[in-house]
């Protein structure tokens, strides 16, 4: 497996992976990443201000994009970045791609000067919840105010 920053040629595939995951879990509803206006062009969004955000993709053994994760400055909490849009193709789940993508995003956030990480998820995403807990995240009483209120 290989990892790199997102490129424009990855946009369509990442959008497909994100939407397929959300559809399968019946989370293709307003307030989720499914309806993010930047979903069709994540590379433009994340690469437009590379000091405050980044998106990394995972490549499978054939070199095809198999998933990704975003990290971006989180407004409202000092020195905080938000882990965003961690989704994998079904063919690579359970193979360590998610854990490695999280490690890459955390390393980027640390090198960019962030001291805290925040993420939002949904209770339907039990595998993701387990990964986040294993990676040291803890549940807070209520989410911060973000556009992804349904997550």
Task: Describe each PLM feature range.
Residues 21-24, 115-151:
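C-terminal "cap" of GNAT-fold acetyltransferases
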Residues 1-3:
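Extreme N-terminal starter segment of soluble prokaryotic enzymes
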Residues 64, 86-103, 107-112, 116-117, ...:
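Conserved glycine-rich acetyl-CoA-binding loop
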Residues 5-84, 89-90, 102-104, 108, ...:
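Acetyl-CoA-dependent GNAT
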Residues 29, 78, 98, 116-120, ...:
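Residue-level detector of alpha-helical recognition elements and their boundaries
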């Amino acid at each position: 497996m290989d990892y790199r920053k997102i490129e424009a040629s990855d946009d369509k595939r990442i959008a497909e992976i994100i939407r397929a995951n959300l559809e399968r879990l019946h989370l293709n509803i307003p307030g989720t990443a499914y309806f993010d206006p930047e979903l069709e062009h994540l590379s433009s969004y994340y690469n437009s201000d590379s000091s405050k955000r980044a998106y990394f993709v995972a490549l499978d053994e054939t070199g095809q994009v198999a998933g990704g994760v975003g990290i971006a400055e989180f407004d409202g909490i000092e020195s905080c970045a938000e882990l965003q849009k961690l989704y994998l193709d079904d063919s690579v789940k359970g193979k360590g791609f998610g854990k490695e993508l999280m490690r890459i995003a955390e390393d980027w956030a640390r090198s960019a000067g962030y001291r805290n990480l925040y993420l939002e998820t949904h209770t339907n995403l039990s595998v993701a919840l387990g990964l986040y807990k294993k990676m040291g995240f803890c549940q807070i009483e209520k989410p911060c105010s973000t556009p992804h209120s349904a997550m």
